[in-house]
Every structure is written in C-alpha cells, then in structure tokens.
C-alpha cells in the first residue's frame, strides 16, 4: 500500500476525476512567523501535496519554527485543516519516518480504520474538512516528482525556505471514487472523586482515553491491544 485515502466530508460518496496535484511545501501559513507556503495558489479542484513536520526539523540551525521541536504547524491535523481553509479538493501528506516520528505501518493502520469526528453542522463539516485526505509513501512522491521533471529532495530543500512558492506537479492527476458509511456513536465521560486524607486540598488526576487504534498487529509479545498508555502517555509523569 503506497497511499491511504479517507474522508470526513459530509457526503455519501467521494468522486474526484483528474484533480491536478500541487506541491505546497510544508503547507503552512504562519503570519506571525513571516511564513506562507500558499503564495498565489488557487487550490480549488486540486490536491495539495504537503510535507510532514515543519521547515526547521531538518534545517542546519533553528529558524522560523524554533528548531527541531515540532510546532502545531508541523502536525498532520494542521495540514488537513489549512488545506480545507484553502478550498483544496484534497490533501496528501508525504510520509517520512523521522519527521513524522512513526513508521508507515502506523499510518496504514490508522488510514484503514474508521475515522471519528465531533458532531458538526453540515456547513461546519464542509468548511473543516477537504473531500479527500490521506498520506502517501515517500517513494511514491519521488516517482510523481520525477515524472514532473523534479527532484523530490531538491524541492524539499526549497520548501525549507520562506521564499518557497507552490509547484504544480505537471500532468500528475488523481481520480478516486468510493462510498462513505456514516454512523452516529454516543460515548460517555466518567468522572469520579475520592477525597484525600492528610492532603485533602491537593489532587492527583488519573485519566484514560478512547484509544485511536484499538486492536492492531501482534507486538513482540503477541499482544494485539494498542494500549493508550504506551501510545500517548509515555511523556506523562505519575506521582
């Protein structure tokens, strides 16, 4: 699998025919950092191809994004959100393990699993989501760039500069046709309190979450459960 395709758009079917692909670098518009990857580009009816993370991750020195520590501009969620604000028909993120911080297996697993969204009005859902969203492997991106007479690494280096401008990927086009199934799911939050003793005016918070992945491929010990504490909470402390 070289590409994963999904949609949170409020429609019954995603039908796109011959949508042109446009490389928009890191897909970031950050006025406060004097950065705009969308200079003079109209993405209506087009697919935005974007890099994961931000321009500082592989830079020789900290720049507009304060070094290697990822900003929200580097998150995949931001890439999808900004492309939707720009009116793109779709967005494809180029996967690379180091800047993404996870391998293709993770992308593939989440990309072939159901998506969840909060309940929205039709208008809000249309504004917040592009009709199509997904990821593609770097090798596929390299081939698409090569067919357009471009070197992927060279274009990536250009995207690390504030003067980067979007690049049409020549004759590269995307056509898709798939149905969407929607279900309303009701979940419940559980909140409880156990009063303390000697330090009753203080609190220790114990929390959990609905894991985004649930069941996956067996790990080294054969466990197929994608435990949230390992998935998301390894940076947390307990006391």
Question: Residues of each region from the PLM?
Answer:
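Second-shell loop/turn segments in exported
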Residues: 7-12, 23, 32-38, 62-80, ...
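Mature extracellular/periplasmic domains of secretome proteins
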Residues: 11-12, 37-43, 78-89, 106-121, ...
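Long, well-ordered, tryptophan-enriched scaffold segments
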Residues: 85, 89-98, 102, 108-188
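Short, solvent-exposed loop/turn and secondary-structure capping segments
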Residues: 33-36, 59-64, 95, 100-107, ...
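Catalytic-core environment of secreted peptidases
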Residues: 2, 42, 46-73, 90, ...
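Noncatalytic luminal/extracellular "stalk/propeptide" segments of secretory-pathway proteins
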Residues: 1-62, 168-189
